[in-house]
Amino acid sequence: MSRYTGPSWKQSRRYGISLTGSGKEIARRNYVPGQHGPNNRSKLSEYGLQLAEKQKLRFTYGLSERQFRNLYVAATKVKEGTVGYNFMTLLEQRLDNVVYRLGLATTRRQARQFVNHGHILVDGKRVDIPSFRVQPGQVISVREKSMKVPAILEAVEATKGRANFVSFDADKLEGTLVRLPERDEINPEINDALIVEFYNKMM
């Protein structure tokens, strides 16, 4: 399954979670898209609930099913911690996500574009792979030639608060993943146990 590239508001309303980070698409119409959206309140089966939770998280990070599943498999091989927590942590360690968490982009989709276009450095070296796994202590910065890109400057100015597990220097346009996040610091609205149950049945 390829990565979804359509309007993010449709998936936001379908799964009841803001994919843009603004929450406006949910506040405006808090029901699924389509002609019968307001009346579409059918009860989901156990499988349906698990699938919906998986899709909700997958669309939040903007990954294809293959990318998402491969990361889940990697999480099952981590010796310490629960699979659910390890999976969420690996998602958070993606370079595009860290760029978003630092406030260098307004959405994860935009962060992925910045990485792909070579605007981002890791420990002073350009990395254009969105899935690059950032380790605590690594410095994420903007390439000197990209420091005046309007979209980056606008994102930094628009960011009002940042997660406790990152630090950011707005003057230098650089930040650090200080530590791995606690579970309650990342997507607390996601029930990762349902996702684990889903993949346990599929694998």
Curated annotation (Swiss-Prot):
This is Small ribosomal subunit protein uS4. SUPFAM superfamilies: Alpha-L RNA-binding motif. Keywords: Ribonucleoprotein, Ribosomal protein, RNA-binding, rRNA-binding. Residues 93-156 form the S4 RNA-binding domain. It comes from Lactococcus lactis subsp. cremoris (strain MG1363). Coiled coil: none annotated. One of the primary rRNA binding proteins, it binds directly to 16S rRNA where it nucleates assembly of the body of the 30S subunit. GO terms for molecular function: rRNA binding; structural constituent of ribosome.
